C-alpha cells in the first residue's frame, strides 16, 4: 500500500489534517465542476485569505445522516457496511501527502474474502434536489473517483437521500484514466497555486469582486465589437423590462381599484361556498420599527458609538 491511514483524536484535529491537502470534496472545484465554489475561491480559502468554511446546519445534518444513508444502502443492496469506517479518519497518499480523502463509509465487496483490497467506498449524500442516477452531479462523481484512487480500491457507490423522502444509489467502478487526469490538475493546483502562490484566473463576477473590490480611479478598458454590442443589447433589454414593469403596475393598480375594501377577488360565477380566488389584498400584521432618525437626534453620542463603516461596493451602471 502506498498510503497511510490517520485516525485523529477528535473532529478538530481531523479538520486540521484536511486543511493540509486537497480533499475529495475540493477536486470538483479544481476541475471547475463545482457549482458552489470556484478554483479562485478555494485558493483564497487554502491560502488563509478567507475564513475556513463554517459548518452550517445542512452540513451538520448531512454528517449526522450518513448513518441513515448507509443503512438504506445496506438494505437495498445487502452489502455489509464496515462499522469501523464510521467517524472522522483520513487516507493520505505517501508520495504526495496533499492527496488525502475521508470516506463516509466503506463496505465489504460480496463474494470476496474480507481484506483491505476487497472493500468499496460509500459516499453518502443528503440533498434537496432531484437526482438522476444516470446523470450524477459531476462534482459527486469526481469526489468518489478521487477517493477510490487515493485508497487504491476498485469499487464504490454514491447513495443519496432526497428531502428525507426518496433514496437512490449508483454503484461505480474506478476509472483510472479519469483519476490520472484529476491528479494532473490537482498537482498543478497544489504546486503552482498553493505552493507557488499563483492566483487562479477569475471565472465569474464573484471572483472579480474578490480580486478587485474597488475600482482604479481613471482606469478604462476599451470595448471590442462584441462587448459594445452586448452593451447595446443590455440597454434594449433594460428598456423592455422597464416598459413591462410600468404595465405590471398599471394592471395591478386596476385590480386594487376594483377590490376597494374587499379582501379577495374571485372568478366570475364562483360559488360563495367555495370561490375561486384570483387575487387578495390584505393588510400585513403590525410591526415594530426602530426610529433611527429620532434616536440619532436625541442621543447623538450614544448613536455615534454604534456606527461603523461599510466599504462601498462596486455599482454597475449602463451609460
Label the predicted regions.
Residues 138, 173-242, 297, 318-319:
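Short, charged, low-complexity amphipathic alpha-helix
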Residues 1-121:
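Metal-dependent nuclease catalytic cores that hydrolyze phosphodiester bonds in DNA/RNA
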Residues 71, 145, 235:
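Short alpha-helical basic/polar micro-motif
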Residues 61-69, 178, 243, 247:
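Short amphipathic alpha-helical segments
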Residues 59-60, 75-103, 107-194:
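Nucleic-acid nuclease catalytic cores
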Residues 95-97, 242-319:
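Extended, charge-rich alpha-helical segments
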Amino acid at each position: 500500500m502506498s498510503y497511510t491511514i490517520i485516525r485523529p483524536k477528535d473532529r478538530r484535529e481531523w479538520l486540521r489534517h484536511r486543511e493540509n491537502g486537497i480533499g475529495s470534496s475540493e477536486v470538483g472545484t479544481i476541475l471547475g465542476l463545482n457549482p458552489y465554489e470556484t478554483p479562485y475561491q478555494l485558493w483564497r480559502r487554502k491560502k488563509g485569505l478567507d475564513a475556513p468554511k463554517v459548518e452550517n446546519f445542512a452540513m451538520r445534518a448531512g454528517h449526522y445522516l450518513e448513518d441513515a444513508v448507509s443503512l438504506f444502502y445496506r438494505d437495498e443492496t445487502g452489502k455489509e457496511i464496515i462499522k469501523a469506517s464510521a467517524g472522522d479518519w483520513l487516507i493520505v497518499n505517501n508520495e504526495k501527502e496533499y492527496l488525502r480523502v475521508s470516506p463516509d463509509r466503506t463496505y465489504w465487496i460480496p463474494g470476496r474474502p474480507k481484506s483491505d483490497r476487497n472493500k468499496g467506498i460509500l459516499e453518502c449524500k443528503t440533498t434537496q434536489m432531484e437526482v438522476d442516477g444516470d446523470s450524477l452531479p459531476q462534482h459527486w462523481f469526481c469526489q468518489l473517483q478521487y477517493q477510490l484512487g487515493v485508497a487504491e480500491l476498485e469499487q464504490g457507490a454514491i447513495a443519496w437521500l432526497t428531502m428525507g423522502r426518496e433514496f437512490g444509489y449508483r454503484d461505480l467502478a474506478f476509472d483510472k484514466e479519469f483519476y490520472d487526469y484529476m491528479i494532473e490538475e490537482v498537482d498543478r493546483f497544489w504546486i503552482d497555486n498553493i505552493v507557488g502562490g499563483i492566483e487562479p484566473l477569475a471565472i465569474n463576477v464573484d471572483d472579480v469582486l474578490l480580486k478587485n473590490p474597488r475600482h482604479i480611479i481613471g482606469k478604462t478598458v476599451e470595448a471590442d465589437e462584441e462587448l459594445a454590442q452586448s452593451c447595446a443589447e443590455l440597454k434594449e433589454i433594460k428598456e423592455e423590462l422597464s416598459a413591462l414593469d410600468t404595465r405590471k403596475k398599471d394592471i395591478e393598480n386596476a385590480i386594487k381599484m376594483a377590490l376597494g375594501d374587499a379582501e379577495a377577488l374571485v372568478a366570475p360565477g364562483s360559488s360563495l361556498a367555495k370561490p375561486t380566488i384570483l387575487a387578495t389584498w390584505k393588510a400585513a400584521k403590525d410591526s415594530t420599527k426602530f426610529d433611527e432618525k429620532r434616536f440619532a437626534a436625541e442621543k447623538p453620542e450614544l448613536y455615534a458609538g454604534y456606527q461603523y463603516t461599510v466599504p462601498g461596493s462596486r455599482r454597475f451602471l449602463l451609460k
